[in-house]
Amino acid sequence: GKAYQTSGGLHGVGASVVNALSSSMVVQVARNKELYEQRFSRGIALGNLEKIGNASNRRGTYVTFLPDKEIFGNHKFKPSRLFKSIRSKAYLFSGVEIRWKSEIRDGETPTDATFHFPGGLSDFLNETLNGVSTYANHPFAGSVDFNEKFQIPGKVEWAINWTPSRDGFVKSYCNTVPTPEGGTHESGFWAAILKSIKTF
C-alpha cells in the first residue's frame, strides 16, 4: 500500500521542514575533493550552490542550522534526545559514519562522538543484548529490496535473536522513524516469521 510511501522521508521532508523553521541553515557537501555550500533562511535560498574550496580529506554532507526564535522562542534542544535519535540513525544506515558535535553541555551527553556500525541492525541487537543469554550466537539478520525482487519501491531489514527470558523487546522503524506502537509493517513481518517457523 501507499500508507508509508512518503511519511517521515529520508531527508527531503526533514530537510525542507528544518529549513522552513530555521533563521539560518547552511549545507556543505564535500564531493570529488571539492567543497560546495548553500545558505538558506526561513526556507528561502540566499543564493545559489557555490564551490567554496577544496576538500581533499573530507567527504559527506554537513548541515548547520539555528531554529527561528520567532517560532520557537527561547526553547533549547535536549542533547540527550537528539543524541539517541542520531545514534539510532547510524544503526539504520549501516556503514555510514555520523559525527555528533554539540555546543550544549548537559552533563550526561557527550559533546563529541562518532557513530559507525558496519553491521547495522545486528550491531544494535548485539549491543542491546550484551551479556544476555541467547539461543543463537549471532542474530538472524538480512534484508530484501522489493524493487529488485518485485519491481515495487521499498526495502525491509531485520535482526532477530531469541533469549530464554520472556522479557523480549521489539523495536521497529518505518522510513527511519520509530514506530513504538507497531503498525501494519510490523504485524506483517511477525506474521511472515511465524508462518516460516511453522513451515520449517
Question: What are the language-model segments listed below?
Answer:
Residues 1-130:
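GHKL-type ATPase core
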Residues 80, 88, 95-200:
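GHKL/Histidine-kinase-like ATPase module
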